Amino acid sequence: MLEQAPDEVQEIIEQGGVVAYPTEAVYGLGCDPDNDEAITRLLALKKRPWQKGLILVASDYQQLLPYIDESRLTNEQLNKVFVKWPGPFTFIMPIKPGLSNLLCGSFNSLAVRVSSHPTIQAICQRLGKPLVSTSANHAGEPPAMSCEEIIAKFDGEIDALISGSLGAERKPSTIVDAISGKVLR
């Protein structure tokens, strides 16, 4: 496993790699959202069923537009989202037709977040698009909180580790349905 700086993982991700990186609250695992092979590998590493869906994190809202159907959200709904971004709020939004089921799972919606974490911002800016993001753990286990835990859980299974500080949040992001406004987590 290569320990990398955020600006050094672009090629790894573009070539289908899976990387670990700090987020607002825990370490995450991520890959290219347009590479089904990489997503399948990520799901296998986590032992996570594809039906649950995944989260996309982005450096700005524009990066999410190829994946979400903005036309199905009102200006009022979008404004409630924009007030919370960038930050530790993940919103469930309608998907564009043809989106990979590996991203949205068995749903017709997708969890998305514009992150304020500098590492995620840097990765997504380099990629020019969002990153698949899920907590760095095997399904049912607590998420990794340090580089040491990443190495213990995933050594030899991921392609790069970006070390860095976690954000100030004590728990993973709040998840809100963008249409109903209902808090789901």
Curated annotation (Swiss-Prot):
It is found in: Cytoplasm. This is Threonylcarbamoyl-AMP synthase. Residues 3-185 form the YrdC-like domain. It comes from Shewanella sediminis (strain HAW-EB3). InterPro entries: DHBP_synth_RibB-like_a/b_dom (IPR017945), Sua5-like_dom (IPR006070), TC-AMP_synthase (IPR023535), TC-AMP_synthase_SUA5 (IPR050156). SUPFAM superfamilies: YrdC/RibB. GO terms for cellular component: cytoplasm. Keywords: ATP-binding, Cytoplasm, Nucleotide-binding, Nucleotidyltransferase, Transferase, tRNA processing. It comes from the Bacteria. Required for the formation of a threonylcarbamoyl group on adenosine at position 37 (t(6)A37) in tRNAs that read codons beginning with adenine. Catalyzes the conversion of L-threonine, HCO(3)(-)/CO(2) and ATP to give threonylcarbamoyl-AMP (TC-AMP) as the acyladenylate intermediate, with the release of diphosphate. It is an enzyme of class 2 (transferase). Belongs to the SUA5 family. TsaC subfamily. It catalyses: L-threonine + hydrogencarbonate + ATP = L-threonylcarbamoyladenylate + diphosphate + H2O. One of its GO terms (molecular function) is tRNA binding. One of its GO terms (biological process) is regulation of translational fidelity. Gene3D superfamilies: DHBP synthase (3.90.870.10). Pfam families: Sua5_yciO_yrdC (PF01300). Its EC number is 2.7.7.87.
